[in-house]
Each structure stands twice: as C-alpha cells, then as structure tokens.
C-alpha cells in the first residue's frame, strides 16, 4: 500500500471529507478490535458469550496482523479515521465487501452501546468449568496447574476452531457456535447446582449422624458412670460383710460372755446398710429406663420414693373377646402400687401368640395406654371358650368401668405377673388399713386439742384422783414415774383415758352407794349419776351408726344426748347455786368426760361427711348435698361443711379437666382450640352449678343464722378462673399467640395474635360462656381482659 497512485490518493481524500461516517469511525483510537477476536489479547470483550478466541481486525489495525477476510497484510499509513473497506487492496467482490462492512458495523455498534451479546470484562480461562459431552464434542478436565479446558470437535480446541474455521465463517455460523457454547454452559451450571445440592445433603446427613453418635456416647458415658457406682457399692458391701464374717476370735470372745447377747438382745455392732442405697439406686435406674423406652409412661407413673417395678413381661397379647383372637402385642409392668399397660406402636409384630413375644416382633417402641392403682383393679384367670386354646393362659383385668383380656403362651410369665400383682395389692391393702387405723386413732385425732386435755386435767383434779403424768401435751400417758403399760397398746389414747375415768367414777359411786344408799337417794345424786351413765352408754349406739355410715341417725342421737346432758348440767348448777351442801364433783366430772366423748363423735361424723363430699361429689344430687350441709349445721360446723363442699368441687373440676389433657399431646392448632373451648365450657358449667347449689342450699341456712356473707364463694370462683386464665394463656402461647415484648409496668409478656381465624373461633366460644356466668351473678370479664383485647 506504499505505492498508491495519485487517483487512489484523491479517492482517499474524498472519502476523508465525507460528512457521514461509519459507526466504527466515531472512535478516535487507531486500533479497532473485533468483538469476536479480543480474547487472546486479554482486553475487555462485549461478545455474547466468551468463545475462547479472538478475531483479527478485518479493516486493518496497523499492527501487522493478517486480515481475516482478505488474507493480506495491509499496513495502514493513513489516519485511523479513514473509511477502509475490507479487502480493498486485494480486489474482490464489491457487494461482499459491503456486506462485511455492514456486518462489522452492527457488531461494533452493539459493542459500543453494551447490547446483545457483548461482555463487560475479560474471561478467566483458568477457572472455566468442564464442558459436558454434547453430540460429538468431548470435554477434557482441568489438566496441570493451568487447568485449560479442552473442548474438541474433530481434534480442535475452541480457540483453534475460532481461529481456523470461524475466522472465515459468517455471523450466522458464529452465532450458532455461540448457542452451542451457551447450551454447554447451561448444562455445566445445572451439573454444578446438582453437585452442590447433593454435597449439601450429604453434609446435613453426616451432621445428623454425628449428632446422634455424640448423644449415644454421652448416654453411654452416663450409663457407664452409674454402672461403676453400683459396682463400687457392691464392692464396699462385700468388703464390709467379709470384715464382719471374718472378725477376729478375740472380739467374738469379748462379745460372747455379755448377758445382753445371752438374752437375745442384738449387740451394738455396726450393721451394713449399704444394700439399701444400692436397692434405691436400682429402682431409680429402672424408672429412668422405663421413661426412656416407653413413650407416655411419665404421664401415668410419677417417680415417687420407693416406687419400683416388681415384675414385667412382654409375652402378652390383648384379646378381642368377640372372637377370642389376639389383637395387639402388650407389655405388662407390675409396680409395687401400680399396673401399667403398654402396647407396641408398630403393627409388624407377630400376630400369633405362640410365635410372638418380647423377642418375636419388630424392635418398635412401646406406648403406655393404661395405668391403674393395684387397689382399684382386679386380676383373675379365665378360660377361653375355644377348645384348642389349652396351651394359652388368659387373665382378665377389671376396673370400675373397663375390662381387658390378655393372653400368653408362657406359664412362667403368667405366674410371674399374677404373683407380683397379688403381692403388691395385698401389701397396699395392708398399708392402707394401717394408715386408716392411725388416722382413726383418737391419739392422732384433730379433736384432741390442748383445750380438751386441759379440761380433762381440771376434771381429774376436781375428782381428787389426778396423778402427775396421766396425760401430757403430746398425747401420751405415763403413770407413776413414767412406766408404760405393755399389755394395752392403745392405753395412751384419749378414748381409753375417758373410758378409764368413767369406770373409776362408776366404781367410786357404787362404793358410796353401798355405804350411804339412803343419803344419796335423798339428795338426788344417784338420779343424775344414773342418767349421765345411761346417756354415756348410748354413745355406743352412735359409734354403730357411724360405722354403718348412717350419719343422719348418728347426728340425731348426738343431738338428743347433748340436749339431755345440757338439762342435767343445768339441774346440777341450780343445786350447787341453791346453797345446799351437796357434793356433785363426781357428776360434774362424768359430765365433762361425756362432753369430750360427744365432741370426738362429732369429729368422726364430720370426717365421714367430708369423705363423701370429696369422693362422691359427681354422683351426689341436690337433696344429698342439702342433707350433708344440714348435718354440718346440726353439728355446729357449717363453715367446715361449706369449705369442704367448695374443695370437693375444685377436686372434681381438676379431675374432669385432667381427662382432656391426655389427648392434647402432639396435637394440631385446631385441636388446641377445641381443647381450650372444652376447657372453658367445663369450668363455666361446674362453677355455675356450684353457684346455684350455694344459692339454693347454703344461702338459706346462712340466712337462718343471720349471716348473708358470700365472700367465700366469690373468692373460690375468682381463684378457679384465675387458674383457668393462666392455663389458657399457656396453651395459646406458641400456637395462636406470639410474644412481642415485655410490659415494663406489670413485668408480663405482651402477646400478639398469630392465627387470627382460629383465635376468633375460640373467642366465639369464650364470650358466650362468660355471659352465662353473668346470668348467675358472676362477672369475671376483667380476669380474661388480657385475652379478649389482643390484637
């Protein structure tokens, strides 16, 4: 191009003075890069997608590069603003040159305006992902330290294909190849995402496995520690026993001549009691293992002191009495005071009793379903009506309203369960009898107050037969320097003391009657004495009525006896105040003793009435409650009767509500709303019933005594609904309510409604119930204000 003719120079000058220039000549730089050919130079490219190679400038860049369209090595000796047509120096078709110029104009314009397939930055060839196999294209991984990605099509890499094939190709071919690379990129991106997701899942699973392993190791560590402790206890116990057994002969000889040992009195040698500690430790371990392996056992069994498992058996099946076929694998746990029934959650256990058992089914967890105290259930062996069930053993568990039949194929398991049940039940019955005898013993009776003992001592002093040490404030009796009678174990009781006093007074009076019979008859002393004695004997009839739970007859007899004793006391008082020289000390003493006996009978009657209220309140009708409270009024203990009635209603309310709690575990939000609605309805109905009973029965009795105070009832209602409000908040929080902060004034959490629809449904149940309370004169809206006004 150095030897241009003058005509060519003139033509160049005309082109230079053109008013309209091509788009790519708006840039004043000397070099014009093809957007498809700048990858190898490291410059920024705005191509559609990095194709891995670069194009040589088709219109001469002044850098000695070969023209990609003409193959000529054109040197530019003119300004970069000249309009140079590709291939102008080498001839060629003018139309094709115009097409090439237009195509390059489009691409350069797209590059300048940042549109279409242009890019904004260089491509990092070292971090390109591996391309998947598509058609005949094969990919090679990252090799060596450089990690060049090789995509071969017929043995050519991407760069080689661009330089050798696409450099002479059209824009359509370049665009097609770009689309091919774009598909490869999408496939690679998808594979990368899939690999990332899979790796994340593997990491999560590994984390979960590690956590479970850690928990098992911690549990194993604790179990091992407990095992070493128990082994240590056993070792210490064995060492102590060996020391006691192999005691030196000299020590045995020192103990042998003692009279205490010859008389059978145990020596003061220190005993080994470590086995008790080991036993309690084993019992605690059993309960912990039960709570761990039996779901729901903690709801039925409380870890009380000395509660332990006596026997357990898993070779049982619950029997359908309709067809006498086994239905559910069952595990029986016999405690010293309870019997717990558990079933397997999984249904994959064996259904045949001959093949099923604790080891025959799947290793599924147990679910506790029933639990009764041993004294409230009976266990009996029954026989199946089928003749082919001779090898099976059946038992029937009966409670008040439920009955279950269980079967086993093992006689040893049958014997183990029945013997453990009978042993535990008999021990419980015996302990309850001992407890009842202690409670009913007058030495522990609430009626033995200090005032009664003081009156008894005064009566004894007045009679002249008082001895120091007969009674003390602790309720014991020690006569004559602290000696106790070993023949009568209940001699220290108040009843025995009262009976002894009565007997001595009777004996003394009879001896006086023999010597002064006529004199006593003249002053009327024998008449009063005999009347008091007759009335005192009628107290035995009161005891008979109390033992038969005939409290109305007992109260009637007590009222008659009290009335007659009151008349006798008035007559004796009139004689003493009349100035007559009459000795009535014996009559007054016997009268005081009779009063104390009557007071004890009243206490026994009131205890029986309280027992009926507490245990039969759900079955008692209005007339029965009226009779009980009337009896309390006749005994002059109306306050105790009213309080006992309110306490029994509280216990009945708690028992009724506790039956709903079992079904709440693991429930949904709708179940929580239903539970709280039932809770509200039950509380309102029972409180409403209590208020109506109070107004119909108790209020008229109080009115007869001139007392119209009902503050006790109001306080009871407020306490019950305060507990209900706390319970409702407890279940609403986390399900329908969320906490949004703390109230600085009341130091209570501020709640907000999370599930508005369910919360409104609950309010639709709650508000009518509160309106029902207003119909009986009770307004407790202020207690539930924090729930009703939530937003």
Curated annotation (Swiss-Prot):
It comes from Candida albicans (strain SC5314 / ATCC MYA-2876). One of its GO terms (biological process) is Golgi to plasma membrane transport. Residues 16-101, 247-271, 432-495 are annotated as: Disordered. The keyword Cytoplasm does not apply. Component of the exocyst complex. Keywords: Coiled coil, Cytoplasmic vesicle, Exocytosis, Isopeptide bond, Protein transport, Transport, Ubl conjugation. This is Exocyst complex component EXO84. Residues 247-256, 448-460 have a biased composition (Basic and acidic residues). Belongs to the EXO84 family. Residues 23-42, 438-447 have a biased composition (Polar residues).
């Amino acid at each position: 191009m150095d030897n241009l003719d003058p005509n060519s120079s003139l033509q160049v000058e005309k082109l230079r003075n053109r008013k309209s220039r091509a788009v790519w000549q708006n840039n004043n730089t000397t070099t014009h890069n093809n957007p498809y050919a700048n990858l190898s130079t490291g410059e920024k490219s705005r191509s559609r997608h990095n194709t891995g190679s670069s194009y040589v400038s088709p219109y001469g860049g002044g850098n000695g590069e070969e023209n990609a369209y003409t193959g000529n090595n054109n040197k530019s000796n003119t300004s970069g603003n000249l309009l140079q047509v590709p291939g102008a120096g080498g001839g060629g078709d003018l139309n094709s040159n115009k097409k090439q110029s237009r195509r390059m104009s489009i691409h350069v314009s797209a590059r300048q305006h940042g549109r279409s397939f242009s890019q904004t930055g260089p491509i990092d060839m070292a971090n390109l992902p591996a391309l998947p196999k598509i058609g005949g294209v094969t990919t090679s991984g990252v090799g060596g330290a450089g990690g060049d990605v090789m995509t071969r099509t017929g043995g050519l890499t991407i760069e080689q294909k661009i330089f050798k094939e696409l450099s002479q190709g059209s824009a359509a071919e370049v665009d097609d190849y770009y689309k091919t690379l774009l598909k490869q990129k999408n496939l690679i991106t998808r594979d990368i995402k899939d690999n990332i997701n899979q790796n994340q899942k593997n990491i999560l699973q590994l984390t979960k496995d590690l956590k479970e392993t850690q928990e098992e190791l911690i549990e194993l560590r604790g179990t091992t520690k407990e095992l070493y402790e128990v082994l240590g206890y056993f070792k210490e116990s064995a060492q102590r026993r060996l020391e006691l057994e192999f005691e030196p002969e000299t020590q045995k000889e020192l103990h042998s001549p003692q009279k205490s040992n010859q008389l059978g009195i145990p020596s003061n040698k220190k005993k080994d009691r470590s086995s008790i500690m080991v036993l309690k430790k084993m019992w605690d371990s059993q309960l912990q293992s039960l709570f761990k392996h039996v779901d729901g056992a903690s709801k039925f069994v409380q870890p009380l002191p000395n509660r332990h498992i006596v026997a357990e058996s898993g070779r049982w099946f619950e029997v359908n009495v309709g067809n006498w076929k086994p239905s559910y694998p069952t595990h029986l746990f016999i405690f010293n005071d309870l019997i717990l029934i558990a079933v397997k959650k999984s249904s994959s256990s064996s259904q045949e009793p001959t093949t099923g058992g604790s080891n025959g089914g799947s290793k599924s967890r147990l679910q506790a379903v029933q639990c009764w105290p041993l004294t409230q259930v009976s266990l009996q062996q029954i026989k199946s009506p089928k003749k082919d069930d001779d090898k099976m053993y059946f038992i029937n568990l009966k409670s008040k309203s439920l009955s279950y039949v269980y079967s086993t194929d093992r006689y040893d398991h049958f014997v183990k369960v029945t013997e453990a049940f009978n042993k535990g039940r008999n021990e419980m019955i015996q302990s309850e009898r001992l407890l009842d005898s202690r409670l009913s013993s007058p030495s522990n009776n609430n009626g033995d107050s200090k005032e009664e003992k003081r009156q008894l001592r005064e009566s004894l002093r007045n009679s002249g037969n008082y001895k120091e040490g007969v009674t003390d404030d602790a309720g014991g009796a020690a006569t004559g320097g602290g000696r106790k009678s070993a023949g009568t174990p209940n001699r220290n009781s108040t009843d025995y003391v009262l009976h002894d006093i009565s007997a001595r007074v009777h004996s003394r009076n009879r001896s006086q009657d023999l010597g002064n019979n006529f004199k006593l008859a003249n002053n009327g002393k024998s008449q009063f004495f005999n009347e008091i004695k007759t009335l005192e004997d009628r107290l035995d009839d009161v005891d008979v009525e109390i033992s038969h739970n005939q409290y109305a007859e007992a109260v009637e007899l007590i009222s008659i006896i009290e009335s007659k004793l009151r008349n006798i006391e008035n007559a004796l008082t009139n004689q003493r105040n009349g100035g007559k020289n009459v000795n009535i000390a014996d009559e007054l003493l016997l009268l005081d003793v009779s009063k104390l006996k009557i007071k004890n009978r009243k206490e026994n009657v009131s205890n029986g009435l309280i027992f009926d209220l507490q245990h039969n309140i759900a079955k008692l009708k209005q007339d029965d409650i009226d009779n009980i409270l009337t009896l309390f009024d006749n005994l002059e203990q109306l306050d105790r009767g009213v309080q006992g009635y309110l306490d029994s209603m509280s216990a009945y309310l708690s028992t009724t509500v506790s039956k709903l709690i079992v079904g709440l575990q693991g429930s949904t939000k709708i179940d929580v709303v239903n539970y709280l609605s039932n809770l509200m309805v039950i509380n309102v109905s029972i409180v409403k019933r209590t208020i109506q009973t109070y107004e119909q029965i108790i209020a008229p009795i109080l009115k007869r005594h001139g007392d119209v105070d009902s503050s006790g009832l109001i306080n009871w209602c407020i306490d019950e609904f305060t507990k209900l409000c706390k319970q409702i908040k407890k279940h609403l929080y986390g399900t329908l309510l969320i906490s949004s902060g703390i109230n600085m004034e009341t130091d209570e959490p501020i709640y907000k409604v999370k599930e508005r629809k369910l919360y409104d449904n609950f309010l639709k149940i709650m508000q009518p119930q509160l309106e029902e309370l207003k119909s009986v004169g009770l307004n407790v809206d202020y207690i539930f204000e924090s729930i009703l006004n939530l937003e």
